[in-house]
Amino acid sequence: MDDSGYFCLVKVINRTVLLLSMVSLFADVASEMLYPVIPVYLKEIGFSVLLIGVLEGVANFTAALSKGYFGKWSDEKGQRLPFVKLGYFLSAVSKPMLAAFTYPVWIFFSRTIDRLGKGLRTAARDALLSQNATPETKARVFGFHRSMDTLGAAIGPALALLFLVLFPKNYPLIFLLAGIPGLISVALVFFLKEETKPSSTLGKGNFFSFFRYWKVASPQYKKLVIGLLILALVNSSDIFLLLKTKEVTGDDRLAIGAYILYNLVFALAAYPLGALADKIGIKKVFLSGLLLFAVVYFLFGIAHSPVVIFSAFAIYGIYAAATEGITKAWITNLAHGQNTATAIGFYTSCESICTLLASILTGWLWGAFGSSTALYTIAAVSLVVLFYFLLFYRGNATTG
């Protein structure tokens, strides 16, 4: 990067954005250290595959609903940091909690605490990022944050592999060690500052009152969210891509290596593609990413060699960089300022529920018709979403 590029980065990425990005990096190191370990550990202590599925389903559903609720609460208070602090704290302490007992109820409680922490912080954190950007710089801000977050997601599994080599099957030790980067993320949160913003105009309500945002949302927001949720209904868990990798290669280490490659490409590409989105328009970059998504799932469908698998994971990283960060920027540009966290929370709650349904649907297709049919179906539906945005969504450079 030349001097002009460096000073441009410093101008866009202020202290708050940098700190939030570092917080996410360490939090993701902690979470992703356990991502490849938890399913194996649960089977070791006697969990059936069904019980593992129920556990993850309950934990993720908790996170899904809580994102909208706590996002709206954050807007009502006109504050972000209390939700960010408590959210990261709960996720950090949940990791070493797993080492304490092997009772199913305790494991359920620990995983639910972790996901509740994610639900607490997500909308408030993204609203805080939005407050520290302009419509012209949001894609870069969210892209930078995602790049740091995803770098942590690459470091975490690599550390897990190292610890499993050094301390085979010593899962309690790994859970305790995962608490260290988690607590570092909590410590960094306390260096953040914010100004209280005007409170939400939606008024208070019950746990599900964040759904009322749909009534006051702009037509552009509604069109965007409809398209994103159709995509989410087929965008199933990455575990299916790892299963396909294991099916093709027969090697767990290659599967984890491919997942690390995906995260590294994602981390490296997120900021440059965010900068490109700020320059040429969010919609153009997003649709390019959506086309890559279809290509990736087609490649996984035809894959019969590690070369195709690793190529698909690399392209998948570019897709994620072209969509995940800038989607949040897109949504916040369309939200009413005092309801930003509610707008994010509404979308992320609905997206999480759709993703859970997508995993169930993909699992059924996989079992009934084979892996290739499931993967081709996802590719086909993503192309339908691509045409939806081309035909029905209109926006300018900052709204798509």
Language model regions located:
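Helix-loop junctions on the cytosolic side of multi-pass membrane transporters
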Residues: 181, 189-203, 390-400
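Transmembrane alpha-helix termini and helix-breaking/packing motifs in multi-pass membrane transporters
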Residues: 40, 44, 155-173, 357-373
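Cytoplasmic helix-loop-helix junction between adjacent transmembrane helices
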Residues: 110-151
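Helix-to-loop junctions at the C-terminal end of transmembrane segments
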Residues: 66-78, 164, 269-282, 366-367
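Structural signature of the two symmetry-related core transmembrane helices
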Residues: 82-96, 179, 284-299, 379
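Helix-loop boundary and gating motifs at the non-cytosolic
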Residues: 10-63, 220-258
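Symmetry-related core transmembrane helices of the 12-TM Major Facilitator Superfamily/SLC fold
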Residues: 172-190, 375-391
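Juxtamembrane intracellular "pre-TM" segments in multi-pass secondary transporters
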Residues: 2-14, 195-227
